[in-house]
Amino acid sequence: MSTPALLHQIQRWIEIETPSHDAAAVATLARLVQADALAAGLSAQLQTLGDEVGPLLTVSNRESGDVRPGILVLAHLDTVHPLGSLARNPLRIEGDRVFGPGGFDMKAGACVALTALKNVSARQANSLPVDLLFVPDEEIGSAKSRSLIENAARNARYALVGEPARAGGHCVTARKGIGALRLQAHGCAAHAGLQHHLGRNAIRELAHQVLALEAMTDYEQGVTLNVGRVEGGTGTNVVPDRAALAAEFRVPTQALAESVHARLMALEPCTPDVRLQIDAWLKRPPYEKTAASNELLAQAQLHAAKAGFELQEAPMTGGASDGNFTAAMGVPTLDGLGVAGDGAHTAHEHFLVSSLGPRLAFWTSLLEHLS
């Protein structure tokens, strides 16, 4: 496919707005992609994930009965941009840059991956089978898709993720894991004027806990903990009997994830007669670099050189992706293989037209020759 034809295809995808929480909108694009894949002779199956998110689309070049471990490619069709974003931030081309909500993250990369799979299928290359998953809820944690991603990973020799390239076109070989914390303090209500001494202020307790939680951040170890939301109380004339916070933690290794989780679950109240209710869990496991992923990177770098660009690895990133799931399962995973650009999740989000041709050539060569 020529660069103008590929660009036109990506523009069609961008013109269909797909916020994560709008199941119908995501389904509209999923059906368009499905029809395109079927027309190219690929199998393409939609799986409904309930009413809250759109369907998951699996596109594959497997022949009937082919159960060999293959290449799992991960992409997502949802974006962080709400409906109406396109009217405020219209699709437009300014020189080498293509602006539009969700183009860089990650409709361009997803379209490039699909086009590469169509190229490999058309050539009838004797390569590993490829399963390409278009996830509908990646931007909100992939809670509905996770089990399907992990199930596909069980039959994968490699995992390639079409998330946007990092600065300089670099790829991703490690990501932090993300955990969540919900903490409630339960005290005792009282009239703030008549019986203040009988009250047990849950907000006061929560203030102590916020300081303790923020103190767990350790930049040297790569651990961060952020209290992002607090709420409690009913009025200034009532000693509050309940207060709650929501926080997240990010960790570079599974060992640190377990350590932080243990510390969170061991938190104790600082105020007499106040009880804490703690719920902490890991939403995405850490994506750790391994010898096997280094070997995959080396292979990818050879194919990038053939396509005319140098593929370097970016430092570990605090942002997570669906690659966290595959890497945690021991599947050699390479991420950030999408197009070059900048401004993900912002109004100035854009990708570079000049990166489309080289990235398509790279993806096609990589899918064709990985063994």
Explain the meaning of each model-derived region:
Residues 1-101:
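Acidic/His- and Gly-rich active-site-bordering loop/insert found
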Residues 70-72, 98, 105, 157-161, ...:
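Short glycine-aspartate micro-motif
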